[in-house]
Amino acid sequence: MKFVILLTIGLLVVAAIPQRRQQQQQQQQQQQRDEREIPPFLEGAPPSVIDEFYNLLKTDENKTDQQTEADVEAFINRLGGSYKVRFTQFMEEVKKARADYERIHQQAVARFSPAAKDADARMSAIADSPHLTTRQKSQQIQAIMDSLSESVRREIINALSPQE
């Protein structure tokens, strides 16, 4: 009799393991969603829309900036309504932020050592290339940063880090 009870308990535990794993996976996925920063133009969007947006960005790592921008615009146009209005506002803010960054960047470059200026010029050419994918840009810029001496790397990072 004890054997039957132990066997039954064992079978129940074994049957519950896959269900428990599935619950843990669902909790992990929800945590990842909660930890992601939601772009302002998708505030209030259903989780499925936010997931779709992040999946789009992930697959677009192998596309050029122009291709990614076209994919994002098509995604936003498909959503329409207030998402489109908020996206337009967001892009205006991005344009201003880019102008501010470029001003700060130029001021920093003016103070760079010759080695930092050279590295910055190479990285800027990569970042501005319309022919490279996001992944290629990231890898090539990282390779340049990794090849720099510690002092030059710190010089660039400190100069371009937001000042508080």
From Swiss-Prot:
InterPro entries registered for this protein in UniProt: ANIS5_cation-bd, SXP/RAL-2_related
Keyword Ribonucleoprotein set for record: no
Domain of life per record: Eukaryota
Residues making up the signal peptide according to the UniProt record: 1-16
Residue segments, region Disordered: 24-43
Disulfide bonds: none
Keyword terms: Signal
Tissue: High levels in the hypodermal layer of the adult female.
Family: Belongs to the SXP/RAL-2 family.
PANTHER family: DUF148 DOMAIN-CONTAINING PROTEIN-RELATED, PRION-LIKE- Q/N-RICH -DOMAIN-BEARING PROTEIN PROTEIN
Protein name, UniProt field: OV-17 antigen
Organism: Onchocerca volvulus
